[in-house]
Amino acid sequence: MSVISMKQLLEAGVHFGHQTRRWNPKMKRYIFTERNGIYIIDLQKTVKKVEEAYNFTKNLAADGGKILFVGTKKQAQDSVKEEAERSGMYYVNQRWLGGTLTNFETIQKRIKRLKDIEKMQENGTFDVLPKKEVVQLKKELERLEKFLGGIKEMKELPDALFIIDPRKERIAVAEARKLNIPIIGIVDTNCDPDEIDVVIPANDDAIRAVKLLTSKMADAILEAKQGEESAETEAKEAETTETTTA
């Protein structure tokens, strides 16, 4: 059975590309036709590519790999946060801070600062500090949480990135490519598919389309994790049986 159906893709508007004047010729192989000045994406190809992305993500997660979800455009922010959290992965859904990957040590220092202020808030330090200082610390905490909250438990570089709109997230794409980190991407008709390792040709502007495809990647991760849990349970049961028999 397919990971996703043509009906689901149609209902979510995944097939609507950009206006014909705003296109990347490299996306030609994923375009079915043109209608009223808009390119229509070939959903048969999208079905296959979603399957490919699903299996890639599932296999990576089964090996203990970590995936960073990236989507800072308004249509993607909520889905990226919800689905990354649901699958126990990391996310960036506000501004991508330059150097998030390529200057990882500096980013880790900012994350440490975020955690230090959180501790101060929790252990009562705020209660003994001057009010003015507390106000400044709270503002700093809010800003750090906004930009780094989704990666504050990311102790090392991710094993892959899942990106919504690589054109919008071109800095993230450039950093991942520089470090040879594979990229899975929702790629619309105005994007360059050559920059992405696993291309999902799809509408990257419709909230429903973004939600549907992002949730499928989270499902792949959860399926891999459930497989791990089942294997662990079976191993424990086998051990118990052996002990009892002995």
Swiss-Prot record:
Keyword Ribosomal protein included in the entry's annotation: yes
Domain of life where this protein originates: Bacteria
Region called Disordered, residue ranges: 224-246
Biased composition (Basic and acidic residues): 225-239
Matching InterPro entries: Ribosomal_uS2 (IPR001865), Ribosomal_uS2_bac/mit/plastid (IPR005706), Ribosomal_uS2_CS (IPR018130), Ribosomal_uS2_flav_dom_sf (IPR023591)
GO CC field: cytosolic small ribosomal subunit
An example Gene Ontology biological process: translation
Record-level Gene Ontology MF annotations: structural constituent of ribosome
Keyword annotations of the record: Ribonucleoprotein, Ribosomal protein
Family, as annotated: Belongs to the universal ribosomal protein uS2 family.
Record protein name field: Small ribosomal subunit protein uS2
Organism: Bacillus licheniformis (strain ATCC 14580 / DSM 13 / JCM 2505 / CCUG 7422 / NBRC 12200 / NCIMB 9375 / NCTC 10341 / NRRL NRS-1264 / Gibson 46)
Organism lineage: Bacteria, Bacillati, Bacillota, Bacilli, Bacillales
This protein's encoding gene: rpsB
